[in-house]
């Protein structure tokens, strides 16, 4: 009986002991911070909602889908406000290390604001440009791509990073080729797709090499384990780092991975060209920053010199090609903006390369420059969309005398071009370039600063040439003299009233550009603080 009682007592205490051990053991269930993931999640849900709603809306109501997309992106932007402290992370490993797959730090929030704001302005450019396009598919693809682009800067492991990159890219292929029956659009989509697939394949090979070397996908853990790589695996690690950079170099349109840019921008619908020039570039640069500065700091001797050379090649290739544009060629205005975006990518690469030689704080210069570039480049595309409604060829010669017919649009475009050139009154463009110069000089990259200075001078020619065209007398117009002249048979061209969404996009970008020029420290402060 005593033995039975003792046995019973032992059995009765066993579950309690097991319960205590279970209570002490860390949970393997990951908690989710829904507020942290709200911006990309809302955008993705809106994409699905728009696609389903398209099935039930009659043709004359399809325009509502565009306003739904606009509302969703505005709401996603508003959801960034409660995250402004930049101290949230989720999908974290619960055992051992505290590595997380999603982090909403200051870098994430700034890039998400850029991406979602760029997508919102793209919607404004598209509202009156989608009548001949499948509305449901168009808005679904745009929102899906924006969701992937918003996810990427928050990704802190290679798996999430690659998935976000592809979610942002795959809808973009379809958007470029969405103009059915347009040979140029189909050709552009095919070039974009094939180039991207090759770059992604090379990048995935690099990711597999990095994983084989470190045994982890979390960026912070990769950085820790690459600090102490066995000599036998050093070559494999270096190869993995180099190949991983290739995929992101393609997304940033860095030379020699830039040849898809002009044909893709020219063949795509104009709003999608604007989207790729800003949001697509933000995706590439944010991914490049994460893998270099966060994951691969131990191999700065590999990616630092490589990115410095790529920066010099990219800005030179873009500016030289822009100089050679024929003003009378069809869509030469869009083609010049495409080559200009390649050159701007070279400037954006400079601080990332500089981070290999000095400190991670140099990354802030890239972020500050990207914010300036996003505002003024989207504004330039908005004015190009206005001109394209009366001149479908969108040649540079079509802009001659724009001030005579559309003075506000001409003034806005002139301001945007001067910002890109870095000349007053585009003060924000000037200061942004100065921060990039400073990053190169502080890192001891004097030769790269000299190359950039030469390229800035080269770019002045085509930016100022386009600006001058805006204020010249229109073709065939009589020269202005001091005496009155009799009216001629050729009346001035009839004024065209721009759609309200296009006008809104121009006003928003021009206002933002003027405010940033008046208070440049709004974005330049990112160049002097750590964003991680």
Swiss-Prot record:
Q: Which InterPro entries match?
A: NADH-Q_OxRdtase_suN/2, ND/Mrp_TM
- Give me the reactions it catalyses: a quinone + NADH + 5 H(+)(in) = a quinol + NAD(+) + 4 H(+)(out)
Membrane topology per the entry is:
Multi-pass membrane protein
Q: Does the keyword Cytoplasm apply?
A: no
Q: Name one Pfam family in it.
A: Proton_antipo_M
Q: So where does this one cross the membrane?
A: 37-57, 63-83, 107-127, 133-153, 158-178, 192-212, 241-261, 276-296, 302-322, 336-356, 367-387, 411-431, 444-464, 504-524
> Which branch of life, at top level?
Bacteria
* Family assignment from sequence similarity: Belongs to the complex I subunit 2 family.
Quaternary structure, from the entry: NDH-1 is composed of 14 different subunits. Subunits NuoA, H, J, K, L, M, N constitute the membrane sector of the complex.
Functional note: NDH-1 shuttles electrons from NADH, via FMN and iron-sulfur (Fe-S) centers, to quinones in the respiratory chain. The immediate electron acceptor for the enzyme in this species is believed to be a menaquinone. Couples the redox reaction to proton translocation (for every two electrons transferred, four hydrogen ions are translocated across the cytoplasmic membrane), and thus conserves the redox energy in a proton gradient.
What's this protein's name?
NADH-quinone oxidoreductase subunit N 2
UniProt source species: Streptomyces griseus subsp. griseus (strain JCM 4626 / CBS 651.72 / NBRC 13350 / KCC S-0626 / ISP 5235)
Q: Which gene encodes it?
A: nuoN2
């Amino acid at each position: 009986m005593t033995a039975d009682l003792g046995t019973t007592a032992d059995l009765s205490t066993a579950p309690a002991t097991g319960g205590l051990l279970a209570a002490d053991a860390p949970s393997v269930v990951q908690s989710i911070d829904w507020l942290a993931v709200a911006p990309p999640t809302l955008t993705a849900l809106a994409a699905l909602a728009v696609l389903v709603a398209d099935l039930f809306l009659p043709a004359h109501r399809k325009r509502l889908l565009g306003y739904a997309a606009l509302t969703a992106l505005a709401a996603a932007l508003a959801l960034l406000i409660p995250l402004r402290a930049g101290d949230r992370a989720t999908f974290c490993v619960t055992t051992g290390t505290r590595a997380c797959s999603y982090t909403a730090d200051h870098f994430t929030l700034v890039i998400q604001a850029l991406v979602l704001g760029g997508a919102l302005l793209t919607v404004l450019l598209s509202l009156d440009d989608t009548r001949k396009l499948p509305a449901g598919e168009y808005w679904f693809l745009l929102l899906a791509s924006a969701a992937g682009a918003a996810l990427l800067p928050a990704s802190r492991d290679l798996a999430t990073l690659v998935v976000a990159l592809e979610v942002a890219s795959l809808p973009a292929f379809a958007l470029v080729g969405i103009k059915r029956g347009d040979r140029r659009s189909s050709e552009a989509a095919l070039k974009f797709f094939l180039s991207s697939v090759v770059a992604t394949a090379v990048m995935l090979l690099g990711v597999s090499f990095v994983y084989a070397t470190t045994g982890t996908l979390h960026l912070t853990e990769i950085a820790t384990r690459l600090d102490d790589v066995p000599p036998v695996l050093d070559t494999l690690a270096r190869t993995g780092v180099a190949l991983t950079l290739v995929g992101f170099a393609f997304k940033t349109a860095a030379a020699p991975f830039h040849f898809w840019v002009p044909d893709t921008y020219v063949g795509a619908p104009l709003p999608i060209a604007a989207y790729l020039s800003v949001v697509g570039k933000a995706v590439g640069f944010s991914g490049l920053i994460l893998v270099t500065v966060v994951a691969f700091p131990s191999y700065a001797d590999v990616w630092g010199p490589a990115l410095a050379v790529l920066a010099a090649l990219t800005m030179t290739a873009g500016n030289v090609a822009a100089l050679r544009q024929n003003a009378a060629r069809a869509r030469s205005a869009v083609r010049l903006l495409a080559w200009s975006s390649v050159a701007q990518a070279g400037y954006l690469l400079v601080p990332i390369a500089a981070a290999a030689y000095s400190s991670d704080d140099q990354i802030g210069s890239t972020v500050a420059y990207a914010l300036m570039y996003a505002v003024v480049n989207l504004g330039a595309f908005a004015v190009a969309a206005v001109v394209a409604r009366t001149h479908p060829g969108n040649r540079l010669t079509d802009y001659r005398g724009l001030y005579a017919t559309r003075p506000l649009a001409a003034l806005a475009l002139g301001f945007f071009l001067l910002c890109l050139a870095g000349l007053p009154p585009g003060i924000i463009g000037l200061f942004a370039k100065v921060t990039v110069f400073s990053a190169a000089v502080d890192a001891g990259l004097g030769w790269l600063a000299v190359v950039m200075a030469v390229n800035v001078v080269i770019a002045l020619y085509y930016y100022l040439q386009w600006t001058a065209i805006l204020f010249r007398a229109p073709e065939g117009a009589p020269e202005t003299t001091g005496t009155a002249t009799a009216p001629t048979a050729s009346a001035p061209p009839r004024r065209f009233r721009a759609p309200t969404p296009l006008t809104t996009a121009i006003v928003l970008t021009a206002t933002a550009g003027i405010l940033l020029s008046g208070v440049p420290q709004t974005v330049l402060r990112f160049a002097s603080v750590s964003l991680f």
